[in-house]
Amino acid sequence: YPWFGKDIRQGIELALENYALLHRLWREEFVDWSGRFRTPLQGFQSTPRPLDGVAPFVWHGSIRSPEIAEQAAYYGDGFFHNNIFWPISHTKQMVELYRRRYEHYGHGSADQAIVGLGGQFFARANSQDAVNEFRPYFDNAPVYGHGPSLEDFSAQTPLTVGSPQQIIDRYMTMREHVGDYQRQLFLIDHAGLPRKTVLEQIEILGTEIVPVLRRELDALRPAHVPDAPTHAARVAARDAALAAADEPAYDDAYRFGTGDNWTGLTAEGGQRAQEQSLARDRRNQARLADSPA
């Protein structure tokens, strides 16, 4: 924070204000804005515009700040709980808060909220081999060492050291505490592991752990619980909404000619843009007039 002239003690306020502005910049062509932490904007257009005119799906990450869970719920965005150093009881509390508020803001039922979790593991074919190999790294790593034992830390956090099946079994239980969730991230290059070992762990994850977790968790997920949104799905939803509202289809063509070297406008291009803007205003006014008081 100090590198950018900010006070880390205002981290939450910065996160809330900055994202509120970013959310508007992605969705509005021209923005007038003022806030606490940066200079005001007047008629500002951010470029480049979002791909296909659709803002990316955003995950809000938090360890222990309920304000970030609230922020994710307010916008209907995803909530990622960075839980790798926390007991499952804390993770459950944070995710439940997000789910309740997601439903409160009208984005869907609580179990349809988009959730991600962290995790970490070390695996070998034989569980005792995994423990024996990982323990020296754990005991001497600054982030772990000289604190709880490997066994105590593993009991209190998602860290799982053992066979691939033990890791699968441990992470299958996460659903029992937080409900169906859409993303599971794993920390692999931790505790000072050498590159060769990290690559071996990635291989085990991709071939022996993830395929089983994906298959088993997908089979348990009810039909009404969605996957995490993809860009293609968000574009399709936007297009369907435009069609349902009898609005013109999205056009990503550059709307201005390039005749004027200063403004990039030609008279024809500027007039066309003005006509499009007026047409949008008329449609908005008509919808307001048709809305119940």
What is the predicted function of each stretch?
Residues 1-293:
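Active-site-adjacent structural elements that line small-molecule/cofactor binding pockets in enzymes
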